[in-house]
């Protein structure tokens, strides 16, 4: 009953239920923390260690994930970061959690005493034990490639005092005696090291180590034992057949060296009881498994790199390989390492030469008996870089390539073809010449290495007028028909012979490969007249297309960014030169001086090269780099702009240009070299700009570091680009019409002023030190 005695019913008209208030749900805020942990791990993986520490500080849950899951540290990136006292704990933690890059860099840092200075008197022993620990970790984590740590501790070892390499070797050997698992690769490395000694006792120990490694499943150790026994096994038919079966087993398991040896062994297939068809199928499988890797991807990663700049770098590496008499395989592996690194990591332009020479140091140690030492490599760059720069970039390279150095190359397939097919010596040299030229052009990388090698052999036989350049036997061996190879042959001819080679800023053509094959050991094959493109098309039976335009920019667009290898040596051919024969130019450090100067300089050069080349100079494990090179007084910006020589004060021009134009008179007591003689190839480091007409390259620094010897080093070498006799440290502006830009100008230090540049202890000027301190805080 309501008010006033009125009775209300509960119908919808008289009675209303209170309406329900609908509460709006707040939208759920989704953040990165809302993701499943598996997804978070994928996000955290491959971040740099600095980013991981920054993420760790954001939230307690992220902190928990970073601190309690090893996979985050195992995949953390330490790119461009080197071990130092400030970040040592981060490196050690990552290495213990399974980070390959951290383990490699720690091992190299302790071995070369770079970045982690030890003030203990027994520096070699302390560092050697620590390096051994992290090298062992790195080898244990290296599951996809051959054992590699032996290349860092291979001889020569120091004969005076303690040697860090020897300490690492002994420590690893002791570890193998105690540890029962994961030691096959370590045993292989120990065996490889001892096998390089001349001592017969050490070689016996090396064989026993390799046998133990083979029993524990190391495939490459098994192949090395097979190779050492091959000569003995081939003398007996029964043992020969058993040896061949073992080789076939190793090849089937994926050993690349065994696959190559098996393919070459098919040349004597009848002796092994194999039918011709079975041999052809075995070789064909090898060739058809070859895959192309498009090197044009380099330029999508390296935005500041051009094809011409890469051409200049590879040309310089060819010149170094020629000077040091390295094999074509070593050169090809070096270039492959450079290209693989460029596809994976950014490289500033001023570090290209450092990358190239570091790859050569690694490859020579991995496959050659004669090595390129770190000191000599620094010298070859005209001391543009320092000892520690090269040591650190070696760690970056091994980390980026994940320890995989040996990969299939064009040379491998070429050697197989030349073993299986009878080819005239000059045709073999021409085929090798063509294979070497393929290194210079990234556009040819669209073809697999096996196809390139086959096309090189076909083109060589065509150029030498073979009536049957590609037989059915070659078709069966490679799986490539004549028509399959025609496009590759045409591209090869265009790039190697039709397109002009790029020129440096001095209008000098970069032809190091051509000069390499002008040697008599190659029967001067590069001097041979080349079959024209029209005649080639006519011989092949295809319609001639308009040749592609040269892909290289004009000389005005080419900037210098490399230093001449050791030296200011040049066999380049200047197109506008009046000299028709420049073949007399040599690639070894020589100079056209007076008799007295030649005697003094020759003695100094002999001493320097004796100390710093080959095995005798690689005493890098004693901390000998300390005090080796002084820090440069200043650095030149690598962005080089071409300047009008009439408007800019440059230093003296090269001897080729200055003598005929300026009529420079020799200093009293010296003999002026004739105009047709090679220019001096050794000069004062402080006066390096006087010789900027090197073999197509110029140093990036305005003044080279001054070398000094550590007092306790004894016979450790100085850089061989030392003060030449009769040179003056003062420089004067040139007043002639120079044909090049002035890239290196430094204030004169007159000898009469009595002011001498004092060597200072090398300091670490790396840019990552601030970051290290930040990460450790």
UniProtKB/Swiss-Prot annotation:
Gene3D superfamilies assigned to the protein according to its UniProt record, in alphabetical order? Cyclin-like, Tetratricopeptide repeat domain
**Ranges for region PEST:** 582-761
Q: Where in the cell is it found?
A: Nucleus; Cytoplasm, Perinuclear region; Cytoplasm, Cytoskeleton, Microtubule organizing center, Centrosome, Centriole
Question: Motif D box 3 located where?
Answer: 349-352
One GO cellular component from the entry?
nucleus
Q: List, alphabetically, the InterPro entries matched.
A: Cyclin (IPR039361), Cyclin-like_dom (IPR013763), Cyclin-like_sf (IPR036915), Cyclin_C-dom (IPR004367), Cyclin_N (IPR006671), Cyclins_cyclin-box (IPR048258), F-box-like_dom_sf (IPR036047), F-box_dom (IPR001810)
Q: Which residues form the F-box domain?
A: 29-76
Domain named Cyclin N-terminal is located at 288-405
Per the Swiss-Prot or TrEMBL annotation, the motif D box 2 is positioned at 343-346
Q: Where is this motif: Nuclear localization signal 1?
A: 20-28
Q: Where is the composition biased (Polar residues)?
A: 751-767
PTMs per UniProt: Degraded when the spindle assembly checkpoint is activated during the G2-M transition. Degradation is not dependent on the proteasome or ubiquitin and depends on the C-terminal PEST sequence. Phosphorylated just before cells enter into mitosis.
Q: What is known of its domains?
A: The nuclear localization signals mediate the localization to the nucleus and are required for CCNB1 localization to the nucleus. The D box motifs 1-4 (amino acid sequence RxxL) are involved in substrate binding, such as FZR1/CDH1, and may be ubiquitinated.
Note the PANTHER family from the entry: CYCLINS (PTHR10177)
Protein name as it appears in the record: Cyclin-F
Organism for this UniProt entry: Mus musculus
């Amino acid at each position: 009953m309501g008010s006033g005695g009125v009775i209300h019913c509960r119908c919808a008209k008289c009675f209303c239920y209170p309406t329900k208030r609908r509460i709006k749900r707040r939208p759920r805020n989704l953040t990165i923390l809302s993701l499943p942990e598996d997804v978070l791990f994928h996000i955290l993986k491959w971040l740099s260690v600095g980013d991981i520490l920054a993420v760790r500080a954001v939230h307690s849950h992220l902190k928990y994930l970073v601190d309690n899951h090893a996979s985050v540290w195992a995949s953390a990136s330490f790119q461009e970061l080197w071990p130092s006292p400030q970040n040592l704990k981060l490196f050690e933690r990552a290495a213990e959690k399974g980070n390959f890059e951290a383990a490699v860099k720690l091992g190299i840092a302790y071995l070369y005493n770079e970045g982690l200075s030890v003030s203990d008197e027994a520096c070699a022993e302390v560092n050697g034990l620590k390096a051994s620990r992290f090298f062992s970790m790195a080898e244990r984590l290296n599951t996809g490639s051959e054992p590699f740590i032996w290349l860092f501790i291979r001889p020569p070892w120091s004969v005076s005092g303690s040697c860090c390499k020897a300490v690492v070797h002994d420590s690893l050997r002791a570890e193998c005696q105690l540890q029962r698992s994961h030691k096959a690769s370590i045993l292989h490395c120990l065996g490889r090291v001892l096998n390089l000694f001349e001592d017969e006792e050490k070689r016996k120990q090396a064989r026993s180590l390799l046998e133990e490694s083979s029993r524990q499943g190391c495939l490459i150790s098994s192949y090395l034992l097979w190779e050492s026994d091959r000569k003995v096994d081939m003398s007996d038919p029964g043992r020969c057949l058993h040896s061949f079966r073992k080789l076939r087993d190793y090849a089937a398991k994926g050993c690349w060296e065994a696959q190559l040896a098996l393919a070459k062994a098919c040349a004597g297939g009848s002796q092994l009881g194999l039918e011709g068809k079975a041999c052809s199928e075995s070789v064909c499988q090898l060739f058809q498994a070859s895959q192309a890797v498009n090197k044009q991807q380099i330029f999508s990663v390296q935005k500041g790199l051009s094809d011409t700049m890469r051409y200049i770098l590879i040309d310089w590496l060819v010149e170094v390989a020629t000077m040091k008499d390295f094999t074509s395989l070593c050169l090809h592996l070096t270039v492959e390492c450079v290209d693989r690194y460029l596809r994976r990591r950014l490289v500033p332009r001023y570090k290209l030469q450092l990358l190239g020479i570091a790859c050569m140091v690694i490859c020579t140690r991995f496959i050659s008996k004669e090595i390129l030492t770190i000191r000599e490599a620094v010298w070859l760059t005209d001391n543009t870089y320092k000892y520690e720069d090269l040591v650190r970039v070696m760690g970056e390279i091994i980390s980026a390539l994940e320890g995989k150095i040996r990969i299939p190359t064009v040379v491998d397939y070429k050697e197989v073809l030349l073993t299986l097919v009878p080819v005239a010596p000059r045709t073999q040299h021409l085929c090798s010449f063509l294979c070497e030229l393929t290194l210079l052009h990234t556009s040819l990388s669209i073809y697999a290495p096996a196809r390139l090698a086959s096309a090189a052999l076909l083109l060589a036989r065509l150029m030498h007028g073979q009536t049957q350049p590609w037989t059915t036997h070659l078709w069966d061996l490679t799986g490539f028909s004549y028509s399959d190879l025609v496009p590759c042959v045409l591209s090869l001819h265009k790039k190697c012979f039709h397109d002009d080679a790029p020129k440096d800023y001095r209008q000098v053509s970069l032809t190091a490969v051509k000069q390499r094959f002008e040697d008599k050991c190659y029967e001067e094959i590069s001097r041979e007249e080349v079959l024209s493109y029209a005649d080639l098309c006519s011989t092949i039976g295809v319609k001639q297309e308009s040749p592609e335009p040269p892909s290289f920019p004009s000389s005005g667009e080419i900037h210098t960014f490399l230093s001449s290898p050791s030296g200011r040596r040049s066999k380049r051919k200047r197109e506008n030169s009046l000299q028709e024969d420049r073949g007399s130019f040599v690639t070894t450090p020589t100079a056209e001086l007076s008799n007295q100067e030649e005697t003094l300089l020759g003695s100094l050069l002999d001493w320097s090269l004796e100390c710093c080349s080959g095995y005798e100079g690689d005493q890098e494990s004693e901390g000998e780099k300390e005090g080796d090179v002084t820090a440069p007084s200043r650095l030149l910006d690598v962005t080089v702009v071409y300047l009008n020589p009439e408007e800019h004060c440059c230093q003296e021009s090269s001897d080729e240009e200055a003598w005929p134009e300026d009529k420079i008179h020799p200093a009293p007591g010296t003999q002026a070299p004739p105009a047709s003689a090679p220019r001096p190839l050794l000069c004062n480091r402080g006066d390096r700009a006087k010789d900027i007409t090197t073999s197509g390259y110029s140093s990036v620094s305005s003044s080279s570091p001054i070398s000094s010897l550590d007092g306790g080093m004894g016979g450790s070498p100085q850089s061989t680009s030392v003060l030449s006799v009769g040179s003056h440290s003062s420089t004067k502006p040139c007043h002639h019409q120079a044909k090049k830009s002035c890239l290196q100008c430094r204030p004169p230090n007159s000898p009469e002023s009595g002011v001498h540049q004092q060597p200072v202890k090398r300091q670490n000027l790396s840019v990552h030190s601030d970051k290290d301190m930040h990460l450790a805080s």
